[in-house]
């Protein structure tokens, strides 16, 4: 009986121990279950984080690819801008050289214009002198013409006198037989008339020579006037051509200056764009 009691007590103890172990096991299982649930929750969170990380990584890769593309595009633009700047620098150098040559041509044209102006002024002075001389020659020609008309009148008068003398001579010759005195008087008068006629003839010859010389001088003056007028016209033409050349060169210089200003503004704009591009690249 005691053995049974002992055994029952032992079994009860064992049962209590078993219950304790079962409770401990259940607690342990519950703890393990809770831990497993926490682990599974953490795993789910980790998976979500991994998925988010993968998404972020994909996005970062896309952003990196986009940034690389933008960087390559920017570098390409920078290279193109640098090439354009170099080309602009060469263009500016050429423009400056062209401006220097244009200034030299302008100086030369200005010197030629001044020379042409001086020549034109000199030609104008000569022309005025020649006009004055021409006016004097015209007065002389008028005087000679008046003298010639007077000589012609004298010649006509001499012709009339000669006709009268001839008529009287005929009358004297007709009356010669009737009156020697009248014939002698008539002969003396004929001698006087012949002397007068000789003087008139000499005057006519002198007037003819003077007229011929005056005509020769007038022709010479007219030739000189034509020569001076031609030289004056040529000088005026050269002056007009030089003035047009100066105007053309001035327009070309203005155009080059405008183009140079435009190129400088464009260079400034490109420099600002380059600075902005470098700032954007530095931001990446």
Curated annotation (Swiss-Prot):
Coiled coil (residue ranges): 1-284
Biased composition (Basic and acidic residues): 110-142
Keyword annotations from UniProtKB, A to Z: Allergen, Coiled coil, Repeat
Family matches, as Pfam families: Tropomyosin (PF00261)
UniProt entry tagged with the keyword ATP-binding: no
Domain of life: Eukaryota
Annotated InterPro entries: Tropomyosin
Biological role: Tropomyosin, in association with the troponin complex, plays a central role in the calcium dependent regulation of muscle contraction.
Domain remarks: The molecule is in a coiled coil structure that is formed by 2 polypeptide chains. The sequence exhibits a prominent seven-residues periodicity.
Similarity comment text for this entry: Belongs to the tropomyosin family.
Name assigned to this protein: Tropomyosin
